[in-house]
Amino acid sequence: MAPAVFTSDYWKKYFSNKKKPTVKNTSDIDLLHINRGRQPFDEGLSINEDSFFYRHNIHVPRIVYLIIVACGSFIITGGIEFAIAYGMYKKTETSVRLWRLPDTLSGDAAVTNFVQAIVTYWVESILVQGDLRSGLVKPIYFGWWPENFLLREVLRAKPRYHFKFIVFRWMEWLVFVGLRGLVWSVPLWFLFWPATVGILCAPGRHEGNDYYFNNYPAPQVFKLIFGGGEGFVLTPWIAFLHMYMYGHYLHVAKNQKSLPKTSDLEQQRGTSSSQPSENDANITALPKPEPKMYENSDLTPARTPVTPAPLEKPVNLAPEVVEPTNAAASPLQLNAPKLTDVDDSALAYDPTKVQDGEDRFVHNDVPLENAENPSRFVHSDAPIDMTHTTTVISEAQNLPSTLLPQDGNAVHHDTDAPSLSNVRKSVDSPRVPPSFSDDAVSSFSLVTAPSINNVGGSTAPSVNNQEREYDYDDTSSRSSTLTERPVVH
Protein backbone atom coordinates (compact mmCIF):
# COMPACT_ATOMS: atom_id res chain seq x y z
CA MET A 1 0.00 0.00 0.00
CA ALA A 2 1.31 3.44 -0.97
CA PRO A 3 2.24 5.91 1.78
CA ALA A 4 -0.26 8.57 2.71
CA VAL A 5 1.89 11.28 1.15
CA PHE A 6 1.13 9.87 -2.32
CA THR A 7 -2.65 9.96 -1.86
CA SER A 8 -4.82 12.86 -3.00
CA ASP A 9 -6.52 13.22 0.39
CA TYR A 10 -3.20 14.01 2.02
CA TRP A 11 -2.54 16.97 -0.29
CA LYS A 12 -6.10 18.24 -0.37
CA LYS A 13 -5.81 19.56 3.17
CA TYR A 14 -2.95 21.78 2.05
CA PHE A 15 -4.05 22.84 -1.43
CA SER A 16 -7.81 23.03 -1.05
CA ASN A 17 -9.79 25.25 1.29
CA LYS A 18 -13.10 23.49 0.64
CA LYS A 19 -14.56 22.04 3.83
CA LYS A 20 -11.19 22.48 5.50
CA PRO A 21 -10.10 24.92 8.21
CA THR A 22 -8.28 27.85 6.67
CA VAL A 23 -6.52 30.88 8.01
CA LYS A 24 -9.67 32.99 7.84
CA ASN A 25 -12.01 30.26 9.02
CA THR A 26 -11.21 30.51 12.71
CA SER A 27 -14.46 28.96 13.88
CA ASP A 28 -13.63 25.67 12.20
CA ILE A 29 -10.13 25.82 13.61
CA ASP A 30 -11.34 26.33 17.16
CA LEU A 31 -13.83 23.51 16.69
CA LEU A 32 -11.03 21.28 15.47
CA HIS A 33 -8.99 21.93 18.59
CA ILE A 34 -11.95 21.39 20.85
CA ASN A 35 -12.57 18.01 19.24
CA ARG A 36 -8.94 17.11 19.79
CA GLY A 37 -9.16 18.10 23.44
CA ARG A 38 -6.37 20.67 23.39
CA GLN A 39 -6.17 24.42 23.80
CA PRO A 40 -5.87 26.30 20.50
CA PHE A 41 -2.67 28.28 20.03
CA ASP A 42 -1.50 27.40 23.54
CA GLU A 43 -3.14 30.45 25.13
CA GLY A 44 -2.15 29.41 28.65
CA LEU A 45 1.57 29.99 28.19
CA SER A 46 1.47 33.60 29.38
CA ILE A 47 -1.31 34.91 31.59
CA ASN A 48 0.44 37.86 33.23
CA GLU A 49 -0.63 40.93 31.27
CA ASP A 50 2.05 43.11 32.89
CA SER A 51 4.93 40.95 31.75
CA PHE A 52 7.28 42.05 29.00
CA PHE A 53 6.59 38.97 26.90
CA TYR A 54 2.84 39.45 27.04
CA ARG A 55 2.91 43.17 26.22
CA HIS A 56 5.21 42.69 23.24
CA ASN A 57 3.80 39.35 22.05
CA ILE A 58 7.21 37.76 22.51
CA HIS A 59 6.88 34.32 24.01
CA VAL A 60 9.72 31.95 24.64
CA PRO A 61 7.95 29.12 22.79
CA ARG A 62 7.76 31.32 19.70
CA ILE A 63 11.44 32.14 19.87
CA VAL A 64 12.31 28.50 20.35
CA TYR A 65 10.09 27.59 17.43
CA LEU A 66 11.81 30.10 15.13
CA ILE A 67 15.27 28.92 16.20
CA ILE A 68 14.36 25.32 15.50
CA VAL A 69 12.96 26.28 12.10
CA ALA A 70 16.11 28.26 11.25
CA CYS A 71 18.50 25.52 12.29
CA GLY A 72 16.54 22.86 10.49
CA SER A 73 16.43 24.93 7.34
CA PHE A 74 20.18 25.56 7.52
CA ILE A 75 20.90 21.86 7.71
CA ILE A 76 18.43 20.78 5.06
CA THR A 77 19.04 23.62 2.62
CA GLY A 78 22.79 23.51 3.08
CA GLY A 79 22.85 19.78 2.47
CA ILE A 80 20.77 20.10 -0.68
CA GLU A 81 22.98 22.90 -2.04
CA PHE A 82 26.12 20.93 -1.26
CA ALA A 83 24.77 17.96 -3.23
CA ILE A 84 23.85 20.16 -6.18
CA ALA A 85 27.29 21.81 -6.21
CA TYR A 86 29.01 18.45 -6.03
CA GLY A 87 27.16 17.27 -9.13
CA MET A 88 27.81 20.49 -11.02
CA TYR A 89 31.49 21.17 -10.35
CA LYS A 90 33.19 17.91 -9.35
CA LYS A 91 33.82 16.60 -12.85
CA THR A 92 34.14 19.79 -14.89
CA GLU A 93 37.08 20.01 -17.29
CA THR A 94 37.56 23.72 -16.90
CA SER A 95 38.31 25.55 -13.70
CA VAL A 96 35.53 27.12 -11.71
CA ARG A 97 35.59 30.89 -12.04
CA LEU A 98 33.92 33.73 -10.23
CA TRP A 99 32.54 35.76 -13.15
CA ARG A 100 32.94 34.06 -16.48
CA LEU A 101 30.64 31.35 -17.85
CA PRO A 102 30.01 28.45 -18.00
CA ASP A 103 31.04 27.60 -14.42
CA THR A 104 30.53 30.83 -12.52
CA LEU A 105 29.96 31.04 -8.79
CA SER A 106 28.49 34.55 -8.85
CA GLY A 107 25.79 33.52 -11.33
CA ASP A 108 25.12 30.33 -9.38
CA ALA A 109 24.63 32.33 -6.18
CA ALA A 110 22.18 34.70 -7.88
CA VAL A 111 20.06 31.89 -9.31
CA THR A 112 20.17 30.01 -6.01
CA ASN A 113 18.90 33.08 -4.20
CA PHE A 114 15.70 33.36 -6.27
CA VAL A 115 14.98 29.66 -6.67
CA GLN A 116 15.60 28.89 -3.02
CA ALA A 117 13.34 31.72 -1.90
CA ILE A 118 10.44 30.39 -3.97
CA VAL A 119 10.88 26.78 -2.88
CA THR A 120 11.34 27.77 0.76
CA TYR A 121 8.13 29.80 0.68
CA TRP A 122 6.25 26.82 -0.76
CA VAL A 123 7.46 24.43 1.91
CA GLU A 124 7.23 26.76 4.89
CA SER A 125 3.76 27.94 3.93
CA ILE A 126 2.51 24.39 4.30
CA LEU A 127 4.46 23.52 7.44
CA VAL A 128 3.89 26.70 9.43
CA GLN A 129 0.16 26.83 8.70
CA GLY A 130 -0.07 23.23 9.79
CA ASP A 131 1.69 24.08 13.07
CA LEU A 132 -0.62 27.03 13.63
CA ARG A 133 -3.71 24.90 13.07
CA SER A 134 -2.46 22.17 15.37
CA GLY A 135 -1.69 24.65 18.16
CA LEU A 136 2.04 23.95 18.18
CA VAL A 137 2.78 27.67 17.97
CA LYS A 138 0.72 30.75 18.81
CA PRO A 139 0.11 33.50 16.24
CA ILE A 140 1.38 37.03 16.77
CA TYR A 141 -0.65 40.22 16.66
CA PHE A 142 0.92 43.70 16.94
CA GLY A 143 -2.21 45.76 16.36
CA TRP A 144 -1.04 47.05 12.98
CA TRP A 145 -1.87 46.02 9.44
CA PRO A 146 -0.51 47.75 6.31
CA GLU A 147 -2.79 50.02 4.32
CA ASN A 148 -0.79 49.79 1.12
CA PHE A 149 -2.46 47.54 -1.43
CA LEU A 150 0.80 45.88 -2.52
CA LEU A 151 1.84 45.02 1.02
CA ARG A 152 -1.61 43.71 1.86
CA GLU A 153 -1.46 41.39 -1.15
CA VAL A 154 2.02 40.20 -0.21
CA LEU A 155 0.79 39.43 3.32
CA ARG A 156 -2.23 37.50 2.08
CA ALA A 157 -2.10 33.96 3.44
CA LYS A 158 -4.47 32.26 1.02
CA PRO A 159 -5.20 32.97 -2.64
CA ARG A 160 -8.59 33.69 -4.13
CA TYR A 161 -9.30 30.45 -5.90
CA HIS A 162 -11.06 30.68 -9.25
CA PHE A 163 -11.29 26.96 -10.03
CA LYS A 164 -12.92 23.96 -8.38
CA PHE A 165 -10.78 21.27 -9.94
CA ILE A 166 -8.04 20.26 -7.50
CA VAL A 167 -5.22 20.30 -10.09
CA PHE A 168 -6.03 23.84 -11.17
CA ARG A 169 -6.23 24.89 -7.55
CA TRP A 170 -2.76 23.46 -7.00
CA MET A 171 -1.50 25.54 -9.88
CA GLU A 172 -3.16 28.65 -8.48
CA TRP A 173 -1.61 28.04 -5.11
CA LEU A 174 1.87 27.42 -6.57
CA VAL A 175 1.75 30.66 -8.55
CA PHE A 176 0.32 32.60 -5.61
CA VAL A 177 2.97 31.43 -3.15
CA GLY A 178 5.78 31.54 -5.72
CA LEU A 179 5.17 35.20 -6.47
CA ARG A 180 5.38 36.07 -2.78
CA GLY A 181 8.56 34.10 -2.42
CA LEU A 182 9.95 35.95 -5.42
CA VAL A 183 9.10 39.28 -3.79
CA TRP A 184 11.04 38.39 -0.65
CA SER A 185 13.99 37.11 -2.68
CA VAL A 186 14.77 40.65 -3.87
CA PRO A 187 15.78 42.06 -0.46
CA LEU A 188 17.45 38.75 0.28
CA TRP A 189 19.58 39.14 -2.83
CA PHE A 190 20.82 42.57 -1.69
CA LEU A 191 21.59 41.12 1.70
CA PHE A 192 23.53 38.02 0.64
CA TRP A 193 24.82 38.29 -2.91
CA PRO A 194 27.19 41.31 -2.67
CA ALA A 195 28.70 40.07 0.56
CA THR A 196 29.15 36.58 -0.85
CA VAL A 197 30.97 37.81 -3.96
CA GLY A 198 33.29 39.96 -1.87
CA ILE A 199 34.13 37.05 0.42
CA LEU A 200 34.86 34.72 -2.54
CA CYS A 201 37.56 37.03 -3.81
CA ALA A 202 39.79 36.18 -0.85
CA PRO A 203 40.27 32.41 -1.37
CA GLY A 204 40.23 32.61 -5.19
CA ARG A 205 43.31 32.69 -7.44
CA HIS A 206 43.38 35.98 -9.21
CA GLU A 207 44.33 35.79 -12.91
CA GLY A 208 43.57 38.76 -15.13
CA ASN A 209 40.07 39.99 -14.54
CA ASP A 210 38.73 36.88 -12.83
CA TYR A 211 39.21 34.57 -9.86
CA TYR A 212 39.71 30.81 -10.22
CA PHE A 213 38.78 27.95 -7.87
CA ASN A 214 39.38 24.21 -7.77
CA ASN A 215 36.61 21.79 -8.71
CA TYR A 216 36.52 20.37 -5.20
CA PRO A 217 35.84 21.23 -2.34
CA ALA A 218 35.69 25.07 -2.60
CA PRO A 219 32.50 25.31 -4.76
CA GLN A 220 30.67 22.70 -2.65
CA VAL A 221 31.54 24.38 0.63
CA PHE A 222 30.55 27.74 -0.82
CA LYS A 223 27.13 26.48 -1.85
CA LEU A 224 26.59 24.80 1.52
CA ILE A 225 27.31 28.01 3.44
CA PHE A 226 25.45 30.24 1.01
CA GLY A 227 22.34 28.07 0.79
CA GLY A 228 22.34 27.28 4.49
CA GLY A 229 22.74 30.96 5.38
CA GLU A 230 19.84 31.98 3.19
CA GLY A 231 17.69 29.22 4.64
CA PHE A 232 18.69 30.23 8.17
CA VAL A 233 17.44 33.78 7.53
CA LEU A 234 14.55 33.31 5.08
CA THR A 235 12.82 30.32 6.68
CA PRO A 236 12.15 31.86 10.13
CA TRP A 237 11.13 35.08 8.39
CA ILE A 238 8.51 33.24 6.37
CA ALA A 239 7.34 31.47 9.53
CA PHE A 240 7.10 34.80 11.32
CA LEU A 241 5.06 36.30 8.46
CA HIS A 242 2.54 33.48 8.63
CA MET A 243 2.27 33.83 12.40
CA TYR A 244 1.68 37.55 11.92
CA MET A 245 -0.91 37.05 9.17
CA TYR A 246 -2.65 34.37 11.19
CA GLY A 247 -2.76 36.62 14.26
CA HIS A 248 -4.33 39.46 12.28
CA TYR A 249 -7.02 37.24 10.78
CA LEU A 250 -7.77 35.75 14.18
CA HIS A 251 -8.10 39.20 15.74
CA VAL A 252 -10.49 40.32 13.00
CA ALA A 253 -12.58 37.18 13.41
CA LYS A 254 -12.85 37.66 17.18
CA ASN A 255 -13.93 41.28 16.87
CA GLN A 256 -16.38 40.94 14.01
CA LYS A 257 -19.41 40.82 16.31
CA SER A 258 -18.57 44.17 17.92
CA LEU A 259 -18.48 46.05 14.60
CA PRO A 260 -21.65 47.75 13.30
CA LYS A 261 -23.66 45.35 11.18
CA THR A 262 -25.36 48.04 9.10
CA SER A 263 -23.93 50.10 6.29
CA ASP A 264 -26.94 52.35 5.85
CA LEU A 265 -25.67 55.91 5.69
CA GLU A 266 -29.07 57.27 6.61
CA GLN A 267 -28.73 55.72 10.06
CA GLN A 268 -25.30 57.32 10.57
CA ARG A 269 -26.41 60.94 10.11
CA GLY A 270 -25.87 63.22 13.03
CA THR A 271 -23.27 60.93 14.65
CA SER A 272 -20.33 63.36 14.53
CA SER A 273 -20.49 63.85 18.29
CA SER A 274 -20.46 60.11 19.01
CA GLN A 275 -17.27 58.34 19.94
CA PRO A 276 -15.63 55.98 17.42
CA SER A 277 -15.65 52.27 17.95
CA GLU A 278 -12.91 50.73 20.06
CA ASN A 279 -12.05 48.17 17.40
CA ASP A 280 -11.92 50.42 14.35
CA ALA A 281 -11.41 54.16 14.54
CA ASN A 282 -12.60 54.57 10.95
CA ILE A 283 -16.07 53.27 11.76
CA THR A 284 -18.40 55.75 13.40
CA ALA A 285 -20.46 54.29 16.17
CA LEU A 286 -24.18 54.48 15.71
CA PRO A 287 -26.18 56.53 18.25
CA LYS A 288 -27.91 54.63 20.96
CA PRO A 289 -31.68 54.71 20.47
CA GLU A 290 -33.67 56.41 23.18
CA PRO A 291 -36.04 54.17 25.10
CA LYS A 292 -39.06 56.36 24.27
CA MET A 293 -38.75 58.80 21.42
CA TYR A 294 -40.07 62.36 21.91
CA GLU A 295 -41.19 61.68 25.44
CA ASN A 296 -40.97 64.74 27.72
CA SER A 297 -39.44 66.73 24.88
CA ASP A 298 -39.71 70.53 24.65
CA LEU A 299 -39.96 70.35 20.87
CA THR A 300 -43.08 68.23 20.96
CA PRO A 301 -46.32 69.98 21.93
CA ALA A 302 -48.22 68.52 24.81
CA ARG A 303 -50.95 66.17 23.81
CA THR A 304 -54.39 67.31 24.96
CA PRO A 305 -56.79 64.48 25.66
CA VAL A 306 -59.76 64.63 23.33
CA THR A 307 -63.10 64.39 25.12
CA PRO A 308 -66.15 63.76 22.95
CA ALA A 309 -68.90 66.34 23.21
CA PRO A 310 -71.97 65.22 25.13
CA LEU A 311 -74.94 64.21 23.08
CA GLU A 312 -77.92 66.51 23.07
CA LYS A 313 -80.35 63.63 23.12
CA PRO A 314 -79.65 60.12 24.36
CA VAL A 315 -79.50 57.52 21.63
CA ASN A 316 -81.81 54.58 22.20
CA LEU A 317 -80.21 51.48 20.70
CA ALA A 318 -82.96 49.17 21.94
CA PRO A 319 -85.55 47.86 19.48
CA GLU A 320 -88.71 49.83 19.00
CA VAL A 321 -91.31 49.03 21.63
CA VAL A 322 -94.97 49.48 20.85
CA GLU A 323 -96.77 50.71 23.92
CA PRO A 324 -100.12 48.96 24.45
CA THR A 325 -103.22 50.97 25.32
CA ASN A 326 -103.52 49.11 28.55
CA ALA A 327 -101.73 51.27 31.13
CA ALA A 328 -101.08 48.30 33.38
CA ALA A 329 -98.92 46.58 30.76
CA SER A 330 -95.17 46.42 31.24
CA PRO A 331 -93.18 49.13 29.35
CA LEU A 332 -90.64 46.53 28.18
CA GLN A 333 -93.27 44.44 26.46
CA LEU A 334 -92.49 43.97 22.77
CA ASN A 335 -95.04 44.20 19.99
CA ALA A 336 -96.11 40.59 20.35
CA PRO A 337 -99.80 39.64 20.57
CA LYS A 338 -101.20 38.97 24.00
CA LEU A 339 -103.32 35.88 24.02
CA THR A 340 -105.38 36.86 27.04
CA ASP A 341 -108.84 36.69 25.50
CA VAL A 342 -108.47 33.11 24.32
CA ASP A 343 -108.79 29.99 26.38
CA ASP A 344 -105.25 28.67 26.19
CA SER A 345 -106.23 25.23 27.29
CA ALA A 346 -108.41 24.85 24.20
CA LEU A 347 -105.72 25.91 21.76
CA ALA A 348 -104.31 23.16 19.62
CA TYR A 349 -102.71 23.04 16.25
CA ASP A 350 -104.63 21.17 13.54
CA PRO A 351 -102.73 21.22 10.26
CA THR A 352 -105.66 19.66 8.40
CA LYS A 353 -107.74 22.76 8.98
CA VAL A 354 -105.09 25.30 8.10
CA GLN A 355 -105.68 26.82 4.68
CA ASP A 356 -104.52 29.95 3.03
CA GLY A 357 -106.14 32.87 4.79
CA GLU A 358 -107.57 30.75 7.62
CA ASP A 359 -106.78 30.85 11.27
CA ARG A 360 -104.13 28.38 12.37
CA PHE A 361 -105.42 28.35 15.96
CA VAL A 362 -108.66 26.37 16.22
CA HIS A 363 -110.82 25.34 19.12
CA ASN A 364 -111.04 21.59 19.19
CA ASP A 365 -110.48 18.77 21.54
CA VAL A 366 -107.83 16.98 19.50
CA PRO A 367 -105.04 16.02 21.86
CA LEU A 368 -101.51 17.05 20.98
CA GLU A 369 -100.33 13.51 20.50
CA ASN A 370 -102.80 13.00 17.63
CA ALA A 371 -101.60 16.04 15.71
CA GLU A 372 -100.38 14.96 12.29
CA ASN A 373 -97.73 17.61 11.90
CA PRO A 374 -96.37 18.92 15.18
CA SER A 375 -93.60 20.78 13.31
CA ARG A 376 -94.68 24.15 14.67
CA PHE A 377 -93.60 23.14 18.11
CA VAL A 378 -90.04 23.31 19.37
CA HIS A 379 -88.95 19.92 20.63
CA SER A 380 -86.35 19.89 23.38
CA ASP A 381 -84.98 16.77 25.05
CA ALA A 382 -83.57 18.86 27.87
CA PRO A 383 -84.65 22.07 29.54
CA ILE A 384 -83.59 25.17 27.65
CA ASP A 385 -81.43 27.14 30.06
CA MET A 386 -82.11 30.56 28.59
CA THR A 387 -83.91 33.53 30.00
CA HIS A 388 -84.86 35.24 26.76
CA THR A 389 -84.16 34.41 23.12
CA THR A 390 -85.05 36.64 20.20
CA THR A 391 -84.58 35.65 16.57
CA VAL A 392 -85.51 37.65 13.49
CA ILE A 393 -87.13 35.57 10.76
CA SER A 394 -86.72 36.55 7.15
CA GLU A 395 -89.24 35.76 4.48
CA ALA A 396 -86.71 35.06 1.74
CA GLN A 397 -84.84 32.27 3.43
CA ASN A 398 -85.34 29.31 5.73
CA LEU A 399 -84.41 29.24 9.36
CA PRO A 400 -80.78 30.22 10.01
CA SER A 401 -78.18 27.60 10.80
CA THR A 402 -77.85 28.81 14.36
CA LEU A 403 -81.38 27.59 15.05
CA LEU A 404 -80.63 24.10 13.76
CA PRO A 405 -79.91 21.27 16.24
CA GLN A 406 -76.63 21.89 18.07
CA ASP A 407 -74.73 19.96 20.75
CA GLY A 408 -76.05 20.97 24.16
CA ASN A 409 -78.94 22.98 22.72
CA ALA A 410 -81.82 20.66 21.94
CA VAL A 411 -83.81 22.82 19.58
CA HIS A 412 -84.95 20.85 16.52
CA HIS A 413 -86.64 22.12 13.38
CA ASP A 414 -88.42 19.76 11.07
CA THR A 415 -87.77 20.20 7.38
CA ASP A 416 -91.46 19.47 6.68
CA ALA A 417 -92.62 22.61 8.48
CA PRO A 418 -95.00 24.89 6.57
CA SER A 419 -93.45 27.71 4.64
CA LEU A 420 -93.15 31.07 6.30
CA SER A 421 -95.43 32.71 3.77
CA ASN A 422 -98.29 30.34 4.57
CA VAL A 423 -97.80 30.77 8.28
CA ARG A 424 -97.71 34.54 7.94
CA LYS A 425 -100.98 34.44 6.00
CA SER A 426 -102.59 32.12 8.55
CA VAL A 427 -102.41 34.61 11.39
CA ASP A 428 -105.86 36.08 11.84
CA SER A 429 -106.24 39.66 12.93
CA PRO A 430 -109.15 38.98 15.40
CA ARG A 431 -106.70 36.92 17.47
CA VAL A 432 -104.55 40.01 17.98
CA PRO A 433 -105.75 42.48 20.57
CA PRO A 434 -107.10 45.72 19.12
CA SER A 435 -104.35 47.67 20.79
CA PHE A 436 -101.88 46.47 18.07
CA SER A 437 -102.23 48.11 14.71
CA ASP A 438 -101.43 46.37 11.46
CA ASP A 439 -98.65 48.78 10.61
CA ALA A 440 -96.92 48.40 13.92
CA VAL A 441 -97.12 44.64 13.83
CA SER A 442 -95.89 44.22 10.26
CA SER A 443 -92.83 46.39 10.83
CA PHE A 444 -91.29 44.18 13.47
CA SER A 445 -91.02 40.37 13.22
CA LEU A 446 -89.73 38.51 16.26
CA VAL A 447 -89.80 35.04 17.69
CA THR A 448 -89.67 35.07 21.45
CA ALA A 449 -88.82 31.96 23.45
CA PRO A 450 -89.72 31.94 27.14
CA SER A 451 -87.44 30.91 29.97
CA ILE A 452 -87.78 27.23 30.80
CA ASN A 453 -85.98 26.04 33.93
CA ASN A 454 -88.05 23.07 35.05
CA VAL A 455 -89.51 20.10 33.25
CA GLY A 456 -92.60 18.02 34.08
CA GLY A 457 -94.70 18.79 37.11
CA SER A 458 -93.18 22.25 37.57
CA THR A 459 -94.79 25.59 37.19
CA ALA A 460 -95.58 26.45 33.59
CA PRO A 461 -93.28 28.99 31.95
CA SER A 462 -94.43 32.52 31.41
CA VAL A 463 -94.68 34.50 28.21
CA ASN A 464 -94.69 38.29 28.60
CA ASN A 465 -95.06 37.96 32.38
CA GLN A 466 -98.24 35.86 32.04
CA GLU A 467 -98.88 32.25 32.79
CA ARG A 468 -99.23 29.98 29.76
CA GLU A 469 -100.24 26.33 29.66
CA TYR A 470 -99.65 23.86 26.87
CA ASP A 471 -101.37 20.70 25.79
CA TYR A 472 -99.08 17.75 25.98
CA ASP A 473 -99.47 14.10 26.82
CA ASP A 474 -97.99 12.32 29.78
CA THR A 475 -95.41 10.48 27.70
CA SER A 476 -93.94 13.57 26.13
CA SER A 477 -93.93 15.44 29.45
CA ARG A 478 -91.73 12.84 31.04
CA SER A 479 -89.16 12.89 28.27
CA SER A 480 -89.26 16.34 26.75
CA THR A 481 -90.90 19.73 26.78
CA LEU A 482 -92.88 21.11 23.84
CA THR A 483 -92.92 24.85 23.61
CA GLU A 484 -94.95 26.78 21.09
CA ARG A 485 -92.97 29.50 19.45
CA PRO A 486 -95.49 32.11 18.19
CA VAL A 487 -94.58 34.05 15.07
CA VAL A 488 -95.45 37.71 15.22
CA HIS A 489 -95.89 39.77 12.07
From Swiss-Prot:
**Membrane topology designation:** Multi-pass membrane protein
Please name the Pfam families in this protein's record: DUF2456 (PF10445)
**Region feature (Disordered):** 260-312, 401-435, 450-489
The record's section on PANTHER family has: FUNGAL PROTEIN
Q: Which GO terms describe its cellular component?
A: endoplasmic reticulum; endoplasmic reticulum membrane
State the name under which the record lists this protein. Uncharacterized protein C594.02c
- Give a yes or no for keyword RNA-binding in this entry: no
